Regions:
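Gly/Ser/Thr/Pro-enriched helix-cap/hinge segments flanking short amphipathic alpha-helices
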Residues: 56, 101, 139-152, 161, ...
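Asp-box/WD-like beta-propeller blade repeats and closely related beta-sheet repeat scaffolds
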Residues: 1-13, 35-36, 51-57
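Beta-propeller domains
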Residues: 54-97, 109-116, 199-203, 208-266, ...
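Extended catalytic-interface subdomain
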Residues: 151-209, 213
Length: 423
């Protein structure tokens, strides 16, 4: 593989009993924002073969991938694929049994382009299918992007020097204007020094005015329609609906996401980590997220907890967030930071037995007192090349757990009430 990659997700997509891989390309060095190559790698007895062209040709250049998730969104017991990235739509690929088909636009996600960083799954509305939390850049930024007036990124070798030149453009008062300063643009494209002589002229120039000076014959454009970190509701009909998470979740880019039933009420809550320190000097750091817990209150409503109530107060340039099983059969949250130490936080003690997924098991259906059910998936690969433990943390209301393999066959049924009696 000759690609600078950032995401790896595993699943048995050919149903032969071993783990195959999707490897997402992140960037072409020196050619930002050209799409790098991504790969579907088929596991043939420990040897991996690139089958991207045969399975889904469009995945080769899907975009600048930051995260991917194998997930059964339509409950047909075949692993589908969702891919997110920078200036990409939330890209949904349905497993047809013979290949992967891009259903992004028909699924209602035609205007979902964002600066996406991360994704994970959870059944948040008790309807037996998987919903998703998708981490974005947030709304605490110098620019504002909407589907009606998206942030745009035009790119080409505008000055014909062999390097790709990106030009970000924002909408203000009926026109698009360059986001970068004149100094930054002329450093990138010195030809502009002879064309735009005064700062006053640049201040009055639209993006079209600047591009008209340059060679735009091979220009391409990407865009960002939405900045918010969202809950992606699975409507169960091959359609999805975006719900922005509460305002505190929009304070900074979201990088790490954990879905876990923290208060043991049978509904998954959300833990978010993030920030971004690698920014332009004129922009400043995105550093307003200290870790955030969103309590699931039902009806796709989430209540942000204060740091005093949640116990989370994480400084730094946060990246992955995972749940690990401790030696005392309880669980902990582990958060990595860019250039810093990892942070560990004990989850509230459950006093319940943890149930481990066995090899070959990919999902479980929990039944609770009162009759409602919740589906849980166990993934191979998470955000920033991380992975949570393959164990279930049970609430006191759980009665039964049915585990399933990759083909939808139930592998075992556990009477949780009986297990509790043994403790």
């Amino acid at each position: 593989m000759l690609s600078s990659t950032a995401a790896v997700a595993g699943s048995d997509f050919d149903a032969d009993g071993d783990i195959d891989l999707f490897v997402g390309g992140r960037v072409v060095p020196g050619q930002y924002p050209k799409a790098p190559q991504s790969y579907l790698l088929q596991n043939n007895g420990g040897t991996f073969t690139d089958v991207t062209k045969e399975i889904c040709r469009s995945l080769q250049t899907v975009g600048m991938v930051t995260a991917a998730l194998w997930t059964d969104f339509n409950n047909d017991y075949q692993p589908d694929l969702i891919v997110v990235g920078e200036l990409m739509k939330i890209s949904v690929y349905q497993n047809t049994g013979t290949g992967l088909t891009d259903i992004t636009d028909p699924a209602g996600l035609a205007q979902s382009a964002g600066m996406w960083n991360s994704i994970t799954s959870g059944d948040f509305d008790r309807d037996g299918d998987m919903d998703y939390v998708v981490g974005n850049i947030g709304q605490n930024t110098p620019f504002k992007a909407t589907p009606e007036h998206p942030l745009k990124l035009h790119y080409a070798d505008f000055d014909q020097n062999g390097a790709t030149d990106p030009v970000f453009s924002i909408y203000e008062e009926g026109e698009y204007y360059p986001l970068a300063s004149l100094d930054l643009l002329t450093a990138q494209m010195p030809v502009l020094k002879k064309k735009v002589l005064r700062y006053k002229d640049f201040a009055q120039s639209t993006t079209s005015d600047i591009l008209n000076i340059l060679e735009t014959g091979e220009m391409q454009t990407l865009q960002c329609d939405i900045q918010a970190t969202v809950l992606l509701e699975n409507l169960g009909t091959g359609q999805f609906k975006l719900h922005p998470l509460p305002q505190l979740a929009q304070a900074a880019p979201v990088k790490g996401i954990v879905c876990e039933d923290l208060d043991l009420d049978g509904d998954p809550d959300i833990i978010l980590t993030g920030n971004e320190y690698n920014t332009e000097v004129v922009t400043g750091r995105y550093d307003a997220l200290m870790g955030l817990v969103l309590r699931n209150e039902g009806g796709l409503r989430f209540h942000p907890l204060s740091s005093e109530a949640s116990g989370l107060q994480i400084s730094g340039d946060q990246r992955a967030a995972v749940i690990l099983r401790k030696a005392d059969d309880e669980m902990a949250l582990l958060v990595s930071t860019n250039g810093g130490a990892a942070r560990a936080y004990a989850l509230p003690r459950s006093g319940q037995k943890l149930l481990a997924f066995e090899p070959g098991e990919v999902s479980a259906l929990l039944t609770y007192e009162g009759g409602h059910q919740r589906k849980i998936e166990c993934h191979f690969g998470g955000g920033y090349l991380s992975q949570s433990t393959r164990s279930l943390r049970l609430s006191p209301q759980a009665k039964e757990a049915v585990f399933y393999d990759n083909n939808g066959n139930p592998t075992r049924t556990l009477n949780i009430l009986a297990l509790k009696a043994e403790l």
